[in-house]
Regions:
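Exposed regions on extracellular, virion, or secretory-pathway luminal proteins
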Residues: 8-12, 25, 113-124, 146-148
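Ligand-binding loop in jelly-roll beta-barrel domains
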Residues: 136-153
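Secondary-structure boundary elements
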Residues: 58-65, 99-103, 161-163
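Low-complexity intrinsically disordered segments
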Residues: 159-164, 168-174
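Catalytic core of non-heme Fe(II) oxygenases with the double-stranded beta-helix
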Residues: 66-139
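Short, charged, solvent-exposed linker or helix-capping segments at domain edges/interfaces
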Residues: 54, 63, 105-109, 165-169
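Non-heme Fe(II)/2-oxoglutarate
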Residues: 1-64
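Nucleic-acid-interacting cores, centered on viral/eukaryotic replication and modification enzymes
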Residues: 81-83, 150-154, 158
Length: 174
């Protein structure tokens, strides 16, 4: 798995996806992770799991006033999501990430400078916020993530209201 993570989150793959231009549909095509929404759960006690998940998701969406959970994923050690840009789901977003030991990262290409930025996970909960643009907008954000420990991501989209997005960030961080 580690070789796959390095391959699909590496520089060669980044350039391959970027060079595809609009031929890339925006979604990640390579990952090692597990969807954690109830409709993907195959474990014991599915009713209890579903109820717990719905309560958590409802609490977050009501508290933040958001409507859409874009991604809810658990990455195992050596898990990853390969380079992609979410041009198929353009919106302001808030991304909560929990990391078991802080041995993961989120990388993105700054759409203005083309610099590759790495945000190292810290142990526990982390918050990232950004905007994933559509093709032609000047703010398409290519990104990937990788971890060597358990890592969970809960991502919510907020539409295209920048002021509301900023208010949410202020609320969460105050």
């Amino acid at each position: 798995m580690k070789g796959m993570a390095d391959l699909y989150t590496g520089e060669d793959e980044m350039w391959r996806i970027i060079d595809m231009g609009e031929e890339h549909d925006g979604a990640a095509s390579n990952s090692v992770c597990y969807a954690i929404k109830p409709d993907h759960y195959n474990g014991t006690h599915p009713e209890e799991y579903s109820k717990t998940w719905i309560n958590l998701n409802t609490s977050l969406t009501e508290e933040l006033g958001v409507q859409h959970s874009a991604l809810s994923t658990l990455y195992p050690p050596q898990g990853f999501i390969g380079w992609h840009n979410n041009a198929n789901a353009s919106a302001y977003n808030i991304i909560f990430t929990w990391s078991e030991h802080g041995e993961g990262w989120f990388k993105y290409v700054d759409p203005k400078t083309q610099e590759v930025i790495t945000i190292q996970d810290e142990k526990g909960w982390n918050l990232k916020a950004g905007h994933f643009g559509i093709y032609g907008s000047g703010d398409v954000v290519y990104h990937s993530a990788k971890t060597d420990c358990y890592r969970m991501t809960l991502s919510y989209t907020l539409g295209h209201d920048e002021d509301y997005w900023k208010d949410c960030i202020d609320f969460i961080t105050s």
